[in-house]
Each structure stands twice: as C-alpha cells, then as structure tokens.
Amino acid sequence: MVQDSAFLAKLMKSADTFELKYDFSCELYRLSTYSAFPRGVPVSERSLARAGFYYTGANDKVKCFCCGLMLDNWKQGDSPMEKHRKLYPSCNFVQTLNPANSLEASPRPSLPSTAMSTMPLSFASSENTGYFSGSYSSFPSDPVNFRANQDCPALSTSPYHFAMNTEKARLLTYETWPLSFLSPAKLAKAGFYYIGPGDRVACFACDGKLSNWERKDDAMSEHQRHFPSCPFLKDLGQSASRYTVSNLSMQTHAARIRTFSNWPSSALVHSQELASAGFYYTGHSDDVKCFCCDGGLRCWESGDDPWVEHAKWFPRCEYLLRIKGQEFVSQVQAGYPHLLEQLLSTSDSPEDENADAAIVHFGPGESSEDVVMMSTPVVKAALEMGFSRSLVRQTVQWQILATGENYRTVSDLVIGLLDAEDEMREEQMEQAAEEEESDDLALIRKNKMVLFQHLTCVTPMLYCLLSARAITEQECNAVKQKPHTLQASTLIDTVLAKGNTAATSFRNSLREIDPALYRDIFVQQDIRSLPTDDIAALPMEEQLRKLQEERMCKVCMDREVSIVFIPCGHLVVCKDCAPSLRKCPICRGTIKGTVRTFLS
C-alpha cells in the first residue's frame, strides 16, 4: 500500500503540499500496488501502472482500474499500453491518452514552481488529471503531466467482465484447454472464457459457470439452458444469423435503445422495456416496431407489458419465440381466444363488394369498419389504379392487423398490393404444378411434415434410391453430410425436386424398408379420402380410428389439433407444431395468422 512504499514516503515528505488521492485513478497509487510484484516478470511496474493497471496480488496478473481488463503471463517484448489499446480500445482511460505521449516522447510541458506547490496530484481538469509520466528520482523537482480519466467509473461490482467482451480475448484464455471434442472457438463464441480447473468456463456477461462437458453438449444451447437471462444471450438472440430479421440495423439492444432518444416523456411505457422486447422507436407519436417480425404497436397504456403485447399481436415472431418461448406465447394467446375470430370468418365467407362492411376488432375498445378503411384517399387512389376491391381490402386488413394502422402513402399500398399479387401468383403456380404431379408425388408433398418427423431409416432409403438411379451419388452424399436431424427433410426435399420418377422410387423403397410408415403415407390415404357418406359402411374400429385421426395433429401424429390457420381455416396441427410451419400442410396456402381453438 501507499503507506508501505519508501518512494512515496520520501515523495510526500519532500512535497507536503501535495494531496495524494488514494484510488486507482492515480498512477502513483497504482504503482504502489506493485511492492510484491514478481521480480522475474519481463515488463516494468512503471509501464504497467502508466497503462492503467494495478497489481491484483496473484502471480503477474494486473487489472485496469477503468475498464476492468485483466492481463497476465507477460512475455519479453510485451507493451502494456499496446495490449491495453488492442484488447479494449473502448476503455475510457485508453481513449484519453495520446499515443505519442510516453516517457520517451517529446519533452513534457513545464509547470511554474508556484503551480507545483499548490496543485494537488489528483487535480482534475478536462486535460490533466492523475497521469504521472515523470521519473522516480526527479519527481519532486520535475513537472508532472496530467491527463483526464474522471469519466472512468469506479471498480464495478457487475459480473460483466469487460476484459472478455470480445470473442478474440476469450479465445486466448484456452491455451491449456483439456478437451478435444469441444472446441474453444465454440465456447468463446457462446460467451465463455476458460477459468479452470478442469473444463470449467465462465460467461463474461452473466458470470455463469459450467463444467463437466460431454460430447453431445452444444456450448450455446447449454448457456441458454442454464442462464436464460444472460444479457449476452439476449443480444445474441437478436442476431440475424439465428433467424430472419426484418431490420438488420436494429438487431442489437443498444441500437434499439438509441432510437428512443426522442421518446415522448408522456409515454406510459419505459423505453428499456420496449427495446428488450425487440421494439425500436419509429420517431412518430408512440409508434414502435419489432426489428424481427416488423410488427408495429402504438397507443400504449399504463400497465401495458411490451412482451405480452408482442405475444398477443405477433405470436409467430421468431425473436419473441426464441427469447420468451412457446409456452409464454401460448399463455398470452389463451387469454385472447377471439382476437382473430372475426377476421377468420371474413376470410372464409364469399366476398360481396356491395355488402355492408365488416368490423375487424383489434383490441378492447378499438375497431375499424371496412367502409371507413376503404374510404381513405390512399385506398381510393389504389382502387382508381385498377386494383380489385377484394385484393385491396384483404391487403389493407392485413396491414392494420400487423401494424395497427392503415397505409399512409399510395406507394406503400401499391408495394403491398404488388407483393400480394406475386404471392397469389406463386400459390397458383404451385397449385398448377401439384395438379400435374403423380399421386405418389402429391402424397409425399402433402405428408412432408409427417415424413420429416417419422422417417428414421434415411441411409437405407438413400442406397435404394441410388441403386434405382432416382438420385445421383452427389445428391446422396449431400444428404449424408447433413446433421442427423436434417437428413430426412433434405431427402424429402430432394425427392420432391426430382419429380414423379423419384417419388415412385421413394414409394417402392419405403414399402420395403418401413412398411408401417408406408401404410400411413400411401395405403391409408384411400380410407382417408372416402366420402363422409361412406364412413358408416366402415367397420366400427375403423370409424373410431378415423374420428381419432381427425383430431390428431397431422405433423407429430401425437397431440390433439388446436390451431386454425388463417386465411385457409384448416384445423390440422397442435399448438406445439404450428410455429414451425409457414404453409398449411393441407392446402399449401401461406399461413398469415393463427387462432387457438379448444375442442369439446
């Protein structure tokens, strides 16, 4: 400590008027911590202190007083300042230093002797405070050069390890990593740095520690499972590499929070809560949008929970599902069972342009009549361009459902209408292609999700298809190189792309290799397609089986159906399988919304 330093004792004796500040922002105080620093370290204590480091007392490990960066294992030729600047360039202390100013740099500015007798060592100004660059022996008579670091926080009590906030810094800690089956690169990418003993690692953000790794473990998955509230995971959860993102520039929490600089002071929901829930501020009123699903919300009220509103209006948002989970979304949806009911009935009923406009409900106390919705200048302009009224109505309804407001400009509406037309054209082309398909290909396409889940004998199927020349050796290898969980889906997609001949070979191969699955996909279709009038002619057991099958999820073939797809209205999957689908497995129509149902 300072009191035990002979040099500092001499200094204070010869410069009684100096007020020495006892904290690590003072270089002299940092220097005093090196009294027990190991003698064999090839880096001088003075250069370490000058670079912002104080001695921790453990081996040759030092720590920056400002950013918390910890370094050890010093080697010949190491420059503390350069390593500090390289590993943590955003450190406030590093940023305040002029790289040209060092002990060997240009001569230091002199201070008048009168100033020397009155200026405290911890003197703070915008340019000079607490940065000592004089020599030991000449300090009492030589001037002192000061630099600003008052912006640096005190030593943080947060678990966040600033030193390890880059993947590169974390990777450097795995020099003695003992395991071969789990790569340091994956651990570092998942936020972990190595602390030992054994295979023990810690997260730089939440300080969560894990050990006893097994071969099947995935670093990122284990991190999420054990420490779901980790701030690093929350930001990572917003990464575009994990799911489709509507606005890439808003994928980080920091980017979203910056948009709230002009957030109305009268707003009833805190900006931090909105940013955490994936929303960024559009700059208008209290309108916010999700960076992932592009869903918009407005008119916030006291007590509103951004996560609940997100799950209420946009239950299929991938960011929402990743962060909060399907169970949370299902609970929220269960509280609003009739939210999309009227929209569904509107989609299923025939369009009558002369009929009275329907009312689409968007929340308690909020409604919008079609007659008003279709009377705005923007909508009228689109109608005058020749777009069909039914297409305009449907497009505007979905815009209001997704964002809570009508189109503001004609150009935006026209873009939406053109996209809707492209989507309709694509669906028509798919439907036409399916009509030309053989029965085998149509059945494989229709039951694709069932095959994804239940086709386990992929390798034998590959060899059968290869010997029948239904697929090429290159296509066979492409399937085998996929992870085990993706091989079935890749094989089915390959067969569907190859066409009728490959589908026939697939059917014949499946009959030999998995007769039970073959019956479910191909044989039982004859019974399923019987007219309703003919069911009574079936045996009682078959009637019961058919009734049970009607209530069974067509994807997992296990749980009861409970989700109605919008706009097609098909009720064919359970609440657990619905989020993974983008098109209805029955009609192949694009799923634009879902409604939870409860069968009695």
Curated annotation (Swiss-Prot):
The modification Phosphoserine is found at residue 138. It catalyses: S-ubiquitinyl-[E2 ubiquitin-conjugating enzyme]-L-cysteine + [acceptor protein]-L-lysine = [E2 ubiquitin-conjugating enzyme]-L-cysteine + N(6)-ubiquitinyl-[acceptor protein]-L-lysine. It is an enzyme of class 2 (transferase). BIR repeats lie at residues 27-94, 167-233, 253-320. Keywords: Apoptosis, Cytoplasm, Metal-binding, Nucleus, Phosphoprotein, Repeat, Transferase, Ubl conjugation, Ubl conjugation pathway, Zinc, Zinc-finger. GO terms for biological process: apoptotic process; cellular response to tumor necrosis factor; necroptotic process; negative regulation of necroptotic process; negative regulation of phosphorylation; negative regulation of reactive oxygen species metabolic process; positive regulation of protein polyubiquitination; regulation of apoptotic process. One of its GO terms (molecular function) is zinc ion binding. The keyword Zinc-finger applies. Belongs to the IAP family. Multi-functional protein which regulates not only caspases and apoptosis, but also modulates inflammatory signaling and immunity, mitogenic kinase signaling and cell proliferation, as well as cell invasion and metastasis. Acts as an E3 ubiquitin-protein ligase regulating NF-kappa-B signaling and regulates both canonical and non-canonical NF-kappa-B signaling by acting in opposite directions: acts as a positive regulator of the canonical pathway and suppresses constitutive activation of non-canonical NF-kappa-B signaling. This is Baculoviral IAP repeat-containing protein 3. It comes from Mus musculus (Mouse).
